[in-house]
């Protein structure tokens, strides 16, 4: 079966996020009042697998081996 998988990767709490800092500064310059702001990367992948659990495991392996650095990133996986 084919499963649509969404992977969201973000920095762990306490990690510096210079992109978010620049965006927050730009928003303030444009007159927008913002509080906390963080960035994340979203990947949508179509995975062929036997079931939802296998698709989730494949996505986890993709994160661990390529997309995420476990020292600085956290990730979530959604399987449809």
List where the protein language model places each region.
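Long, contiguous binding/interaction regions
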Residues: 1-80
């Amino acid at each position: 079966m084919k499963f649509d998988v969404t992977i969201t990767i973000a920095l762990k709490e306490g990690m510096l996020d210079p992109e978010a800092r620049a965006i927050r500064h730009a928003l303030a310059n444009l007159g927008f009042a913002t509080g906390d702001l963080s960035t994340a990367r979203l990947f949508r992948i179509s995975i062929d697998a036997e079931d939802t659990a296998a698709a989730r495991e494949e996505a986890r392996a993709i994160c661990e081996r390529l997309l995420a650095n476990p020292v600085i990133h956290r990730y979530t996986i959604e399987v449809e």
